[in-house]
UniProtKB/Swiss-Prot annotation:
GO molecular function, one term: 6,7-dimethyl-8-ribityllumazine synthase activity
Biological or metabolic pathway of the protein: Cofactor biosynthesis; riboflavin biosynthesis; riboflavin from 2-hydroxy-3-oxobutyl phosphate and 5-amino-6-(D-ribitylamino)uracil: step 1/2
Entry-linked NCBIfam families: lumazine-synth (TIGR00114)
Subunit relationships: Forms an icosahedral capsid composed of 60 subunits, arranged as a dodecamer of pentamers.
BP-aspect Gene Ontology terms: riboflavin biosynthetic process
Name of the protein described by the UniProt record: 6,7-dimethyl-8-ribityllumazine synthase
Stored InterPro entries: LS, LS/RS, LS/RS_sf
């Protein structure tokens, strides 16, 4: 019986894309900083990290697909923040974004990590962007490193 499990060791030459929305920039900027810090802290050179900004979460799957199709990145980290408002727009954006990101990951075989916060209130986002619940950008970066390592091991 074989056992496979990823860890944080990744080839130094591996490139990572951090794809982040500008909407709710106060939150997403903190998520990006956390992801960059986490990658760098695990040996990924700044030159091997590309940061791409899009208008909002809705645009993340399209740009993730373009990046995945180019096969230049070992993983794509997506970061955004959707806060519930008074309309159903929140559900449409959050759900379709998550579905689109999953489709990109499955279609291209490239890890696409979903770090899009879908929260009720701005305070909930702040708690997940360096507040009491940590930094989701850091968590997504660690998951990306682990997935790259795991996929390298699999037959």
């Amino acid at each position: 019986m074989s056992h496979y499990e990823g860890d944080l060791r990744t080839p130094e030459s591996a490139r990572f894309a951090i794809l982040a929305s500008r909407w709710n920039a106060r939150i997403t900027d903190t998520l990006v900083a956390g992801a960059r810090q986490s990658l760098a802290g695990n040996g990924i050179a700044e030159a091997n990290i590309d940061v791409i900004r899009v208008p909002g979460a809705w645009e993340l799957p399209l740009v993730a697909a373009r990046l995945a199709a180019a096969h230049e990145h070992a993983a794509i980290l997506t970061l955004g923040c959707v806060i519930r408002g008074d309309t159903r727009h929140y559900e449409h954006v959050a759900d379709r974004c998550a579905e689109g990101l999953m489709r990109v990951q499955l279609d291209f075989g490239v890890p696409v990590l979903n770090g899009v916060l879908a929260v009720e209130r701005a305070e909930d986002a702040e708690a997940r962007a360096g507040g009491s619940h940590g930094n989701k950008g850091e968590e997504v970066a660690l998951a990306a490193l682990e997935m790259v390592n795991l996929l390298e091991q699999l037959p």
